[in-house]
Each structure stands twice: as structure tokens, then as C-alpha cells.
């Protein structure tokens, strides 16, 4: 994974989504228009965290670069940068971190 020059703000996370399933477990090929959006990806960059209610200190984000995360199906904003597709998520859209 190449270093990306995108730095998310506040509690935002830049994720490179995993590949959508191309075949069912029984061997049937899934056409492009029927593929489910992946809900798993690798964290590429993390923002510094959002400010607390007093604005005195930042609340850090619970994930780090390189973590594999599971995120909300409809969360985030899809972007394309240097020919690669990414997703910018709020930390609230991350449901779990996958253990390695």
C-alpha cells in the first residue's frame, strides 16, 4: 500500500475498501450490477481526532493506519485519487477492527 497524500480532518478516516465478491461459494459468477458494496477495508490515514465539548483537547480516533476495519454499509464518502478508490469515513461509521 503506497503512502497517500490525503490527510483526513478531525475524526475522519481514509479507508481503501476491499474487493467486492466476484463469485458465490457455490461457484456462480456475480455480475457487476449485482455485487454488494464491501464493508471491510484497510485504514490508510487517520485524522487527529475531534475536539471535546470544551474545545480544550482532542479525542483520539480508535483506529490506526494499517488496521482492517468493518464499517457501516452506507457510511462515508467515496473518492477517487490517483486512479485508486477510497472511502472517507467518520470514526462513528467504523463498527469493528479485525484482529490480525
Swiss-Prot record:
GO terms for biological process: chaperone cofactor-dependent protein refolding. It is found in: Cytoplasm. Keywords: Chaperone, Cytoplasm, Stress response. One of its GO terms (cellular component) is cytoplasm. Gene3D superfamilies: GroES chaperonin (2.30.33.40). SMART domains: Cpn10. GO terms for molecular function: ATP binding; metal ion binding; protein folding chaperone; protein-folding chaperone binding; unfolded protein binding. PANTHER family: 10 KDA HEAT SHOCK PROTEIN, CO-CHAPERONIN GROES. Heptamer of 7 subunits arranged in a ring. Interacts with the chaperonin GroEL. Together with the chaperonin GroEL, plays an essential role in assisting protein folding. The GroEL-GroES system forms a nano-cage that allows encapsulation of the non-native substrate proteins and provides a physical environment optimized to promote and accelerate protein folding. GroES binds to the apical surface of the GroEL ring, thereby capping the opening of the GroEL channel. This is Co-chaperonin GroES. It comes from Mycobacterium leprae (strain TN). The gene is groES.
Amino acid at each position: 500500500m503506497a503512502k497517500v497524500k490525503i490527510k483526513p480532518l478531525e475524526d475522519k478516516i481514509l479507508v481503501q475498501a476491499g474487493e467486492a465478491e466476484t463469485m458465490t461459494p457455490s461457484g456462480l459468477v456475480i455480475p457487476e450490477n449485482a455485487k454488494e458494496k464491501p464493508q471491510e477495508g484497510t485504514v490508510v490515514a487517520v485524522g487527529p481526532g475531534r475536539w471535546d465539548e470544551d474545545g480544550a483537547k482532542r479525542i483520539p480516533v480508535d483506529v490506526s493506519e494499517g488496521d482492517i476495519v468493518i464499517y457501516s454499509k452506507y457510511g462515508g464518502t467515496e473518492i477517487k485519487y490517483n486512479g485508486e478508490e477510497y472511502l472517507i469515513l467518520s470514526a462513528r461509521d467504523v463498527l469493528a477492527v479485525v484482529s490480525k
